Each structure stands twice: as C-alpha cells, then as structure tokens.
Design a protein with these regions (language model features):
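N-terminal secretory signal peptides that target proteins for export/translocation
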Residues: 1-2
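Bacterial N-terminal signal peptides
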Residues: 5-16
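Cyclophilin-like peptidyl-prolyl cis-trans isomerases
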Residues: 17-195
Length: 195
C-alpha cells in the first residue's frame, strides 16, 4: 500500500468514526423520572449536560428511595410547589452533604422547570426541589454573589403539568411553625428513573 493510499484510507476511516460518534450522540437521551404523587403522576426530563452535579445528586436520592413517602410541604399557587425533604408528619429527613450551585448553567426558572431549593447560602441545596408554576425570572442567575446567584434549574416537566397545577391549587396554612403547607397532604409516593 502506498503512503498516499494509506493516508486516504486513514482519513476516510476517521470520517466514518466521527460520523458514527455524532449519530450516537443524537441518540443519547436525557434521564427521565416518574414522580408518583397522591394527586397523580408527573414525568420530568433531567439535564445532566447543563447541571451535572445537580442531576447526579437528584438521581442519587431517587435511587436510594429517599423521596418515597415524602410530601410537597410548601405550595404557593402563583410561584412554585416544593417537596423532597419532609415526611407527612413534617419531620425533616437527614440528607447528604450540600452541593455546589449550578444556577449559572443558562437554564431559566420558567413554568414547568425543576430547580433546587436552598437556604440563603447559594451552595446549600441537598434533596429539596421545586417545580416552577410561574415565570420566576427573579430566581435566575445574575452573578456569583449570595443575593444574585439564583436557583439551579436541572430539568422540566414533560408530562403531568395538569397534576402540578392541581397541587398548586390546594389550600395551605401553618403547620409545625411553617407557612404555605398544604392542609391536605400531597404525598410523593415514589420517584423512579424510567429512562
């Protein structure tokens, strides 16, 4: 085989390999979780390319069964529904260590997106998450300061937004010193990864 023929063969082999790799990347699908609640099912697609640490953290809790039997403990009808940290009797579940805030990933707090709940410390998110039921632009990343860091979006509802809207309409009140708690328990029966 001449040197020119060898280079020609090598060049087209590399092109074929790259085309195959690109085709494989198109077929790669994001993880999807099923959130079974006492009011119906919600499916959410997660974005590991945009929020790798957040998705890894969330799926760790999913695979451990952490969310099973927890509740949506904070519901504000024109804002969001929050869950993933309390039992039906309002006991806070022990969690893993907090994760780094990935709110600077370009994803926005829009209706139907999932984001991590946290304290005033930008890097304090553990297990609790919320589903936006409004265009919450004020929660988006602006700069790396405690007041402007934002809340990390890591997924979006792809099925069951009707259920989310039912949850947002439940009556709320005070329970165990906390406000905006549903008066009718909204249980997260089980969360499983289905893709």
């Amino acid at each position: 085989m001449t040197k020119r023929a060898f280079i020609f063969t090598l060049f087209f082999s590399l092109l074929s390999f790259q085309a195959g790799a690109a085709e494989t990347n198109k077929d790669t699908k994001n993880p999807v979780v099923l959130i079974q609640t006492s009011m119906g099912d919600i499916e959410a697609e997660l974005y590991p390319e945009k929020a790798p640490e957040t998705v890894k953290n969330f799926l760790r809790y999913v695979h451990e069964g952490f969310y099973d039997g927890t509740i949506f403990h904070r519901v504000i009808s024109n804002f969001m529904v929050q869950g993933g940290g309390f039992t039906p009797d309002m006991q806070k579940k022990p969690t893993h260590a907090p994760i780094q805030n990935e709110a600077d990933n370009g994803l926005r707090n829009r209706i139907g997106t999932l984001a991590m709940a946290r304290t005033n410390d930008p890097h304090s998110a553990t297990s609790q998450f919320f589903i936006n039921v409004a265009q919450n632009t004020f929660l988006d990343f602006r700069e790396k300061t405690p007041r402007a860091y934002g809340y990390a979006v890591f997924g979006r509802v792809i099925k069951g937004m009707r259920v989310v809207n039912q949850i947002r309409q439940v009556q709320t009140g005070f329970k165990n010193g906390m406000g905006d708690v549903p008066l009718q328990t909204v249980e997260i029966i089980k969360v499983t990864q289905i893709q």
